[in-house]
Amino acid sequence: MFVYDVVNALDYEKARSIITAFISQYVQRAGSRGVVVGISGGVDSTVAAALAVEALGRQRVLGLLMPSLYTPPEDLKDALDVINALGVEWKRVDITPIYDAFVKTLPDFSQENRVAAGNILPRIRMTVLYYYANKYNLLVMGTGDRSELLLGYFTKYGDGGVDFLPIGSLFKLQVRELAARLGFADIAKKPSSPRLWQGHTAEGELGASYEVIDQVLYAVFDLKKPPEEVRGFFGEVVDIVITRVKKNIHKLTPPAYPDITPARRNV
């Protein structure tokens, strides 16, 4: 039972049509042959890849499996099931040797700061994706959703380093609903996890379930409800969410630079 019904706030067929048209037009305008996308076996990459196939055809979508030392076997199985269901070309790049070689070059590397250590993995994946994008004249299609974008729950210049985000307007719960409608009901039920360290789950790190987080985001940012009203239903989670949004807004803006207009000479 939802206080703020974020799941039913969307016309899914219309959203699907808008997103597939967007993918097709964006790729065409870029003069690209298609897209390359990391497929993890999670709900976001599954939905993004499925919509890309619908928009472009399976021949123009390249899927990359990029497991690390923290990737469980069930994720690989799910990713392969998605690839087989969609019929796309794919490649597997095990990034563990790259990660091991990288951290060995850092004189003071430590696992103590697991965020700093964990963020190396998505940045390696970004580099691999852009290698194949450059090689085959493809665009890197990101898989971030609106919940992650608002929260800043992604790695800067990692999974945030992409050319476009087709599901960036959908909340996590809406992505799950769309996944079920696209025929991926089992994946829609999987707990979300970036797999940046052993036992890592998104909801464990965020401190609340997406069932709660998405209602807070939807109420505050779409319905424009005052935080004190939303706090009456969800308590301190509202403050946690709003604080995270404010703290991570820099992830959604270009790098800052000074305005030197006063120093320019009129010549």
Curated annotation (Swiss-Prot):
Mg(2+) binds at residues 44, 148. It is an enzyme of class 6 (ligase). It catalyses: deamido-NAD(+) + NH4(+) + ATP = AMP + diphosphate + NAD(+) + H(+). GO terms for cellular component: cytoplasm. Keywords: ATP-binding, Ligase, Magnesium, Metal-binding, NAD, Nucleotide-binding. InterPro entries: NAD/GMP_synthase, NAD_synthase, NH(3)-dep_NAD(+)_synth, Rossmann-like_a/b/a_fold. GO terms for biological process: NAD biosynthetic process. Deamido-NAD(+) binds at residues 123, 156, 163, 250-251. It comes from the Archaea. Pathway: Cofactor biosynthesis; NAD(+) biosynthesis; NAD(+) from deamido-NAD(+) (ammonia route): step 1/1. Pfam families: NAD_synthase. NCBIfam families: nadE (TIGR00552), PRK13980.1 (NF010587). Catalyzes the ATP-dependent amidation of deamido-NAD to form NAD. Uses ammonia as a nitrogen source. Belongs to the NAD synthetase family. This is NH(3)-dependent NAD(+) synthetase. The lineage of its organism: Archaea, Thermoproteota, Thermoprotei, Thermoproteales, Thermoproteaceae.
